Swiss-Prot record:
GO terms for biological process: fatty acid biosynthetic process; malonyl-CoA biosynthetic process. It holds the Pfam family Carboxyl_trans. It comes from Fusobacterium nucleatum subsp. nucleatum (strain ATCC 25586 / DSM 15643 / BCRC 10681 / CIP 101130 / JCM 8532 / KCTC 2640 / LMG 13131 / VPI 4355). Binds 1 zinc ion per subunit. It comes from the Bacteria. This is Acetyl-coenzyme A carboxylase carboxyl transferase subunit beta. GO terms for molecular function: acetyl-CoA carboxylase activity; ATP binding; carboxyl- or carbamoyltransferase activity; zinc ion binding.
Amino acid sequence: MSILKNLAKNLGLTNITQPKKKYATVGEKKSDEEKERAKYKVKNIDNLKEDEVTKCPSCGVLSHKSEIRANMKMCSNCNHYFNMSARERIELLIDEGTFKEEDVTLTSANPINFPEYVEKIEKAQHDSGMNEGVISGLGEINGLKVSIACMDFNFMGGSMGSVVGEKITAALERAIEHKIPAVVVAISGGARMQEGLTSLMQMAKTSAAVKKMRLAGLPFISVPVNPTTGGVTASFAMLGDIIISEPKARIGFAGPRVIEQTIRQKLPENFQKSEFLQECGMVDVIAKREDLKATIFKVLNDII
């Protein structure tokens, strides 16, 4: 008889239950944390800090962030495409040592005195290390000189305000000035609501610049990647002479759930994905990320 039961008997107590054993038994369920580790098979996860690890939203595998960066921001398990920053896009597409950034000092004002907009801009600048949501300039793709602009989703969701619209317009006008092709990589949640009509005006402004490119007889390559939506889709992003995208990129105006609730119909499978748009004739080429630079160069070589 256990010590606990002897004590209970001496005190005249009944219904005393011994505490449950705390050590593991055969068939005992694993903790949630142990299940996660077993499921994702992450090596040396105990030695990694939380901010050093990223979980793939597609396959669930945990990977070291440095591994993802070294793999062109792709999951090494399922090839899911993580978003690239504007500078990473520049490094991917432009020959090393040839990029010259333009319009570096342009920053947004607060044209309609939207509450807390200035604070949001400052936070986005601090978090992203950028002045605004697009980087533009001149560079070379396999020796071919181009004017390029790359948007960044990390800066307020890649939203297009007055400065983003101005820098994209300037990139197209710079192409006309130098008589070279223009390449714009679009990734955006749409027009920046904090700037009201000023942001909506950028749709017309950038579209007019595309028209100038066309009148000058110069090629404009648009590269909408995941996600490209709203006013950016409804303006310059879908006006390229050739539109190139990455696999499974979502490109559309409103989100699919909003559309389904509006029309009260089920949307087709892969709706708004780049493959679906290619079937409908709205995207010309789908290129894997590792082939994107070579694809743009080949297209430009063929049409110049």
